[in-house]
Amino acid sequence: MQMKVTSEQAKQLLTDQLSVWKSARDNYKALEAVQVKELTVEGCTVKIQFNPARIVSSAAKVDTQSLKERKCFLCAENRPEVQEGLPDGSYTWLINPFPIFPEHFTIPVNKHLPQLIEKRFGDMLRLAQAAEHYVLFYNGPKCGASAPDHAHFQAGNKGF
């Protein structure tokens, strides 16, 4: 089992996947139409992004009944046939087919476990250290994410 996916390996996965996965490629292409505005708030500059294509993911139904009625798309057996991943210990790096970054990855745990950060800080640090060109982040189960029922992190390229 491969451990410690590097930034270079992740970038190659993205390139390989976009060459064969049309809908993901189209969604990455749609990033060109994203509107970005920079604001400075109390001396801190932030970028605000308007990405209408992202509504598919951000407006997904995540109520208890909807989650029961759908197959978890982060579980290996339910992923699209075209989706490949890079094993990384008990996680797998996948490209995010609904990106907000020019290089956007979802890193689910290989078992269907709840999206809880407790006991995963060490994992998060290890993943972040190995893939130094990416910022790693966690969305909690109540933040509007489309996968509140499966433990995962996300990664995106720094400085975009």
Regions found by a protein language model. Name each.
Residues 1-119, 123, 134, 138-141, ...:
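Active-site microenvironments that recognize anionic phosphate/pyrophosphate groups
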Residues 129, 140-160:
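Glycine- and acidic-residue-rich phosphate-binding/metal-coordinating active-site segment common to enzymes
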Residues 126:
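Extended, Lys/Arg-enriched charged tracts that mediate electrostatic binding to polyanionic substrates
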